Regions:
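Glycan-recognition and catalytic cores of secretory/periplasmic carbohydrate-active enzymes
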Residues: 1-138
Length: 138
Protein backbone atom coordinates (compact mmCIF):
# COMPACT_ATOMS: atom_id res chain seq x y z
CA UNK A 1 0.00 0.00 0.00
CA UNK A 2 2.85 2.39 0.78
CA UNK A 3 4.11 2.18 -2.80
CA UNK A 4 0.82 3.60 -4.04
CA UNK A 5 -0.24 5.95 -1.23
CA UNK A 6 3.06 7.11 0.29
CA UNK A 7 1.16 7.15 3.57
CA UNK A 8 3.81 6.68 6.31
CA UNK A 9 1.35 4.61 8.33
CA UNK A 10 1.59 1.83 5.72
CA UNK A 11 5.38 1.93 5.72
CA UNK A 12 5.41 1.75 9.50
CA UNK A 13 3.02 -1.21 9.39
CA UNK A 14 5.19 -3.03 6.84
CA UNK A 15 8.30 -2.45 8.96
CA UNK A 16 6.51 -3.79 12.05
CA UNK A 17 5.34 -6.88 10.16
CA UNK A 18 8.90 -7.51 8.95
CA UNK A 19 10.22 -7.07 12.49
CA UNK A 20 7.61 -9.50 13.83
CA UNK A 21 8.39 -12.16 11.22
CA UNK A 22 12.16 -11.90 11.30
CA UNK A 23 12.37 -11.89 15.09
CA UNK A 24 9.72 -14.52 15.78
CA UNK A 25 11.11 -17.22 18.07
CA UNK A 26 9.54 -19.94 15.91
CA UNK A 27 11.11 -18.80 12.63
CA UNK A 28 13.55 -21.57 11.70
CA UNK A 29 17.20 -20.73 11.07
CA UNK A 30 16.77 -21.19 7.31
CA UNK A 31 13.88 -18.69 7.41
CA UNK A 32 11.38 -21.03 5.73
CA UNK A 33 8.43 -20.66 8.11
CA UNK A 34 6.36 -23.44 9.56
CA UNK A 35 2.84 -23.55 8.18
CA UNK A 36 1.82 -21.71 11.36
CA UNK A 37 4.15 -19.91 13.77
CA UNK A 38 2.19 -21.44 16.63
CA UNK A 39 1.81 -24.97 15.25
CA UNK A 40 1.72 -27.38 18.18
CA UNK A 41 4.17 -29.82 16.60
CA UNK A 42 7.10 -27.43 16.02
CA UNK A 43 9.88 -28.35 15.17
CA UNK A 44 8.25 -31.22 13.29
CA UNK A 45 5.55 -29.04 11.71
CA UNK A 46 5.33 -28.75 7.93
CA UNK A 47 7.30 -25.93 6.34
CA UNK A 48 5.73 -23.49 3.89
CA UNK A 49 7.90 -22.34 0.99
CA UNK A 50 5.06 -20.16 -0.30
CA UNK A 51 5.35 -18.06 2.86
CA UNK A 52 9.12 -17.86 2.43
CA UNK A 53 8.77 -16.78 -1.21
CA UNK A 54 6.28 -14.07 -0.34
CA UNK A 55 8.46 -12.89 2.53
CA UNK A 56 11.57 -12.68 0.32
CA UNK A 57 9.76 -10.64 -2.31
CA UNK A 58 8.12 -8.33 0.23
CA UNK A 59 11.39 -7.68 2.07
CA UNK A 60 13.05 -6.70 -1.19
CA UNK A 61 10.31 -4.17 -1.86
CA UNK A 62 10.52 -2.88 1.69
CA UNK A 63 14.26 -2.35 1.20
CA UNK A 64 13.43 0.29 -1.42
CA UNK A 65 11.58 2.43 1.13
CA UNK A 66 14.07 2.13 3.98
CA UNK A 67 17.73 3.01 4.21
CA UNK A 68 21.03 2.12 5.78
CA UNK A 69 21.37 -0.96 7.94
CA UNK A 70 17.64 -1.66 7.88
CA UNK A 71 17.48 -1.74 4.08
CA UNK A 72 20.63 -3.86 3.84
CA UNK A 73 19.20 -6.32 6.36
CA UNK A 74 16.06 -6.79 4.25
CA UNK A 75 18.14 -7.40 1.11
CA UNK A 76 20.50 -9.76 2.92
CA UNK A 77 17.64 -11.73 4.48
CA UNK A 78 15.91 -12.02 1.11
CA UNK A 79 19.13 -13.27 -0.46
CA UNK A 80 19.46 -15.88 2.29
CA UNK A 81 15.88 -17.06 1.75
CA UNK A 82 16.33 -17.23 -2.03
CA UNK A 83 19.54 -19.22 -1.57
CA UNK A 84 17.77 -21.72 0.68
CA UNK A 85 14.78 -22.03 -1.66
CA UNK A 86 17.16 -22.61 -4.58
CA UNK A 87 18.81 -25.51 -2.78
CA UNK A 88 17.98 -29.21 -2.81
CA UNK A 89 15.73 -29.11 0.26
CA UNK A 90 13.06 -27.03 -1.44
CA UNK A 91 13.71 -26.83 -5.19
CA UNK A 92 12.31 -29.67 -7.26
CA UNK A 93 14.53 -31.60 -9.61
CA UNK A 94 13.84 -30.85 -13.28
CA UNK A 95 11.16 -33.10 -14.73
CA UNK A 96 9.55 -33.77 -11.35
CA UNK A 97 6.94 -32.04 -9.22
CA UNK A 98 4.49 -31.49 -12.08
CA UNK A 99 6.70 -28.81 -13.59
CA UNK A 100 6.64 -26.65 -10.46
CA UNK A 101 9.89 -25.10 -9.25
CA UNK A 102 9.41 -25.36 -5.48
CA UNK A 103 8.29 -28.20 -3.25
CA UNK A 104 6.83 -28.20 0.26
CA UNK A 105 4.10 -25.57 0.43
CA UNK A 106 1.10 -25.67 2.72
CA UNK A 107 -2.22 -24.18 1.69
CA UNK A 108 -4.69 -25.15 4.43
CA UNK A 109 -3.48 -27.75 6.89
CA UNK A 110 -6.48 -27.55 9.28
CA UNK A 111 -8.74 -28.27 6.29
CA UNK A 112 -6.49 -31.14 5.21
CA UNK A 113 -5.95 -29.39 1.87
CA UNK A 114 -2.76 -28.57 -0.02
CA UNK A 115 -0.31 -30.06 2.47
CA UNK A 116 3.34 -30.43 1.48
CA UNK A 117 2.61 -29.80 -2.20
CA UNK A 118 3.70 -27.39 -4.91
CA UNK A 119 1.59 -24.24 -5.18
CA UNK A 120 1.39 -21.83 -8.09
CA UNK A 121 1.77 -18.77 -5.91
CA UNK A 122 4.91 -20.15 -4.26
CA UNK A 123 6.59 -20.29 -7.66
CA UNK A 124 5.13 -16.91 -8.64
CA UNK A 125 6.57 -15.07 -5.63
CA UNK A 126 9.84 -17.00 -5.87
CA UNK A 127 10.31 -15.81 -9.46
CA UNK A 128 9.18 -12.30 -8.51
CA UNK A 129 11.73 -12.22 -5.69
CA UNK A 130 14.50 -13.48 -7.98
CA UNK A 131 13.68 -10.79 -10.53
CA UNK A 132 13.53 -8.09 -7.87
CA UNK A 133 16.84 -9.20 -6.41
CA UNK A 134 18.49 -9.15 -9.83
CA UNK A 135 17.05 -5.72 -10.66
CA UNK A 136 17.37 -3.98 -7.29
CA UNK A 137 20.16 -5.68 -5.36
CA UNK A 138 22.82 -6.81 -7.81
Amino acid sequence: MYRFTKDPAYLNLARNIAKFLLNHPNLPADKVPYWDFNAPDIPNAKRDVSAASIMASALLELSLYTSGKESKNYVSTSADILQVLSGPAYRAKPGTNGGFILEHSVGHLPGNSEIDVPLTYADYYFIEALQRYKKWAL
